[in-house]
Amino acid sequence: DDVESRGLGDVYKRQVIFLKNILLIDFSRSHDMNKKVLLCSLLLSLPLVVSAAETIPLWPNGAPNKSTITEPETTNDKGAIFNVTNGRLEVNVPKNPNGKAIILIPGGGYGNLAMGTFNQSFIPYFLDQGFTTFVLKYRLPKGDPAIPLSDSLEAVKIVRSLFKKYNLHTVGVMGASAGGHLAAMTSVECSGDSCPDFSVLIYPNITMMQEESQPKSSCRNNLIGKDRSVKYDVAYSAYKHVDTKTPPAFLAVSAGDEYAGSLGSMLYTRAMVENARPVSLHVYPTGNHGWGIGKSEKFPDGDKFKDDLTAWLKDIK
């Protein structure tokens, strides 16, 4: 019963509930041997890779830029989290740690945190690869575009301060959609201990320039607003701030993405090349937007994406 208080991630809370229900089976009678065999099989099939998960607040003494959101935080039936005002990291430790950490940053167009694909796909994938995962539940902007970025920069600092505790030596950032934008901005706006060692940008909303943004995307309006001057578009277009210190990046996007588009990823890649920084861009012919790891009906190129990402991550020291 103390699992919830230890901050176990959503993916594994469901496992715990499942185990609690299984353990209610009456094994006291000898003819229940088949149930015992079934239980053992179920336990062996579960990806029990978590140890000592916890939740870490980003600003235990109060954030420097206060959110204007007053509504309570809520989660819908798809796992999307709304009205986030309490920035935090949720930690999951793999069964076979590789000494590397990754901060996972969900999307949601800066209007919510879309956790569905992360819970079902990205978190289990990185744990299986041996990464200690720190899921960033960042505060939503609602009129102040600096709020999410301050949370992500602080998150990198916090993870670095935990290297000894978790036996880590490297930390990267991974984001999808709006989370990809935030991961990219973290990579180009960081300094010192707030700088990640690498970035993984999945169908990222790289640009906030009006003429370069996808019409279907809500990122720009939710982050910057409709009426702000062009200086904000420039300030929050990540590719415009790439320099010779920007960390290595892996980018993946679908050619027909209607929400993030492939242009921003190409512009970021060009900026990395111009600054002689390591970069790997993968544009897939299928998938549109919102896919996860592995082949699916929505994303037939999913296995290729998984292989490309896995190979790239193996080169991270």
Where are these regions (language model features)?
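N-terminal cap/lid segment of alpha/beta-hydrolase-fold proteins
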Residues: 53-96
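Short beta-strand/loop motif that positions the catalytic acidic residue
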Residues: 251-253
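Primarily recognizes the serine-hydrolase "nucleophile elbow" in alpha/beta-hydrolase
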Residues: 154-215, 233
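Mobile cap/lid helix-loop segments that gate and shape the active-site cleft of serine hydrolases
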Residues: 76, 204-241, 247
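Conserved alpha/beta-hydrolase "acid-adjacent" motif
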Residues: 258-264
